[in-house]
């Protein structure tokens, strides 16, 4: 149970970091 929870937490963190990086690159390209 703990392994599944930590796995989903890690997956969510990676998704947030990837999306934030993508948004940052998009803003840089717009400028």
Curated annotation (Swiss-Prot):
It holds the Pfam family PetL. Coiled coil: none annotated. Keywords: Chloroplast, Electron transport, Membrane, Photosynthesis, Plastid, Thylakoid, Transmembrane, Transmembrane helix, Transport. It is a single-pass membrane protein. GO terms for biological process: photosynthesis. It comes from the Eukaryota. The chain crosses the membrane at residues 4-24. Its main location: plastid. InterPro entries: Cyt_b6/f_cplx_su6 (IPR007802). HAMAP family: Cytb6_f_PetL (MF_00433). The 4 large subunits of the cytochrome b6-f complex are cytochrome b6, subunit IV (17 kDa polypeptide, PetD), cytochrome f and the Rieske protein, while the 4 small subunits are PetG, PetL, PetM and PetN. The complex functions as a dimer. This is Cytochrome b6-f complex subunit 6. It comes from Phaseolus vulgaris (Kidney bean). The lineage of its organism: Eukaryota, Viridiplantae, Streptophyta, Embryophyta, Tracheophyta. The gene is petL.
